[in-house]
């Protein structure tokens, strides 16, 4: 567990390519090294690999998206106690569920209704902006950055946004 670099052994071709665009300085080290002074952590790996000490070493008001399921890289209450300001997981039983179920039904509905032949970057950005706009400014806070996954407005608004960005 640590920083993936061009010198990391056992990478497939896609992982190797990702190191070229995500680790420009070809940095190496442990996960703890990577989190020192970081503003954000996006984890999609394994349960309980982030410690409170790692979170405490991050910049003030750090954001953590601990997406491993069913057990995240760090539990939200532990991350917050260690200094994180915003924590999201893939789980519906914690605030800020970050899950593709928020995006995909609306993306596919919009693409199908608009008879799109491909999903473009513009369509994905329109979907993201629609999702971001679903939490009213007055309700936006550290524990409410995402719309509820089963909010009936989500799929409809995302579909409309996607349809409006289909190129003929």
Where are the predicted features?
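Glycine-rich phosphate/diphosphate-binding loop of Rossmann-like nucleotide-binding domains
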Residues: 1-46
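Short acidic, glycine/serine/threonine-rich loops at helix termini
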Residues: 5-11, 53-55, 75-80, 99
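A short, aliphatic-rich alpha-helical micro-motif
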Residues: 34-35, 55-59
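Glycine-centered, small-residue-biased loops immediately flanking beta-strands
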Residues: 62
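Adenosine-phosphate binding glycine-rich loop
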Residues: 66-167
């Amino acid at each position: 567990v640590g920083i993936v670099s061009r010198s990391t052994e056992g990478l497939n071709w896609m992982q190797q390519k990702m190191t070229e665009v995500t680790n420009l300085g070809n940095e190496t080290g442990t996960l703890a090294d990577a989190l020192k002074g970081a503003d954000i952590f996006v984890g999609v790996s394994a349960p309980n690999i982030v410690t409170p000490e790692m979170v405490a070493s991050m910049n003030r008001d750090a954001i953590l998206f601990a997406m491993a399921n069913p057990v995240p890289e760090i539990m939200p209450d532990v991350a917050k106690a260690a200094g994180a300001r915003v924590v999201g997981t893939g789980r519906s039983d914690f605030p800020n569920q970050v899950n593709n179920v928020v995006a995909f039904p609306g993306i596919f509905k919009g693409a199908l209704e608009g008879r799109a032949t491909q999903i473009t970057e513009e369509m994905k950005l329109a979907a993201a902006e629609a999702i971001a706009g679903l939490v009213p400014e007055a309700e936006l806070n550290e524990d409410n950055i995402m719309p509820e996954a089963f909010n009936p407005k989500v799929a409809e608004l995302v579909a409309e946004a996607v349809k409006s960005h289909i190129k003929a």
